[in-house]
């Protein structure tokens, strides 16, 4: 794992997430000057050979401004109506600003199932890759006109992380009104320290995340840390930076303060990237210390090391594996459904046939269907890097 931050222009594929408050003003609507300025930055990156994708918030915020909806929380149907109006205006604005640099914009609206269901995930990835291949800039947003409260990303930070892992990006940049991660909310604690480099997203780092989002947006530092966990586990670095200034990407290149989250040093297969990035695991499997150690050694998860099964999942569903400290250590595809899994926990693999009445798999989750997650993975690989240094 390398903690060295490279210039933006040296990255091959970059995902830029833009918060609603940067694009939309409650009174005046779209911030056209700001949009034109960041399109200058994007054009410069593209000219240097980088593939650039934009995850743009702002559809609901822009739509509610156009419709003159009152301040305060919106009902689901009001949000969907605002999104329907705002998506048209937002796409047009991006297209016009990028066209000044002879760049074509392509709009992609995603729902949670587009990244959680394998076939739709592959289709979405193919579409984005084709847009990049022909030189277009994908402008991506959650399809808020059809997303429901129960089935949605809920914020564009995590959506951006999923897009980054889905398309093999090596850098994710989260632009908002926050310039990075502090040890505590700086407006509440004058002694809060700014963190320029985050090597691992540990429980201590997670505890630092907090604070409510603005009325125009749904994200906060909590969702940015969640995004960092998704991105860095897939080998993608992440930057949290303020976008309040014009040309914010150029500002980052020129040394403006921002927080850098180092990627894990081990690229994983596309299939395992998809498994690791699942936002809604169908269930949980809690394991003992011996099983947890075996997982870190690259072994499959056997029934003997399982202590508890939670949830109602089917065979092939993505599930979270919880270690002895109560934190997620891995994710994988279930080799058994929840009912069968509960019957065989704590038993040896050679006892499965007697219990279930048929010859089943020896592993609860096979190592080919399993990927380690969390800071412990990075610590492990960092030690390996030290050995080989």
UniProtKB/Swiss-Prot annotation:
Domain (PUA) ranges: 282-359
Involved pathway(s): Amino-acid biosynthesis; L-proline biosynthesis; L-glutamate 5-semialdehyde from L-glutamate: step 1/2
Primary location recorded for the protein, binned into one broad class: cytoplasm
GO biological process terms held by the UniProt record: L-proline biosynthetic process
Binding site for ATP: 17, 176-177
EC number, as in UniProt: 2.7.2.11
Gene Ontology CC terms, in alphabetical order: cytosol
Chain's role: Catalyzes the transfer of a phosphate group to glutamate to form L-glutamate 5-phosphate.
Protein name: Glutamate 5-kinase
Protein's organism: Agrobacterium fabrum (strain C58 / ATCC 33970)
Underlying gene: proB
